[in-house]
Swiss-Prot record:
A Gene Ontology biological process term: hydrogen peroxide catabolic process
Role: Involved in oxygen transport from the lung to the various peripheral tissues.
Name of this chain's protein: Hemoglobin subunit beta
Modified residues (Phosphoserine): S44
Lineage per the UniProt record: Eukaryota, Metazoa, Chordata, Craniata, Vertebrata
Length: 146
């Protein structure tokens, strides 16, 4: 991902304010509520029958935390996202058969959750920078698909 120095500063500065555990669960939960067809990849997570069930589901929260920790790792390697996410791309492609479009959906949900949590600090310029980052991560995760 090509970010200007100002964009990199905005991303790292705002990310330092983020509670990854909280935001991860909320982002994955919102993905499953807003795009219910994505639930098919999470059959083992138990009750996903309603928005409140999804948002309070401990397995959703735990996996969301894991997802956002990986995203956080990617922020440290913006110049090599494909390398950083290579094994996750392979897992999601070959073993889990996740539609790569879902990575874009999750990226957009992450941006919504960041806006919600960061409020006025999440300026249009900051959003533009994060949109570049989530698009880059989605592309990297889709890299192993044929």
């Amino acid at each position: 991902v090509h970010l200007t120095d100002a964009e990199k500063a905005a991303v790292s500065g705002l990310w330092s304010k983020v509670n990854v555990d909280e935001i991860g669960g909320e982002a994955l939960g919102r993905l499953l509520v807003v795009y219910p067809w994505t639930q098919r990849f999470f059959d083992s997570f138990g009750d996903l029958s309603s928005p409140s069930a999804v948002m309070s589901n401990p397995k959703v929260k735990a996996h969301g935390k894991k997802v956002l920790n990986s995203f956080s790792e990617g922020l440290k390697h913006l110049d090599n996202l494909k390398g950083t996410f290579s094994s996750l791309s392979e897992l999601h492609c070959d073993k889990l058969h996740v539609d790569p479009e879902n990575f874009k959906l999750l990226g957009n949900v992450i941006v919504v959750v960041l806006a919600h949590h960061l409020g006025k600090d999440f300026t249009p310029a900051a959003q533009a920078a994060f949109q570049k980052v989530v698009a880059g991560v989605a592309t990297a995760l889709a890299h192993k698909y044929h």
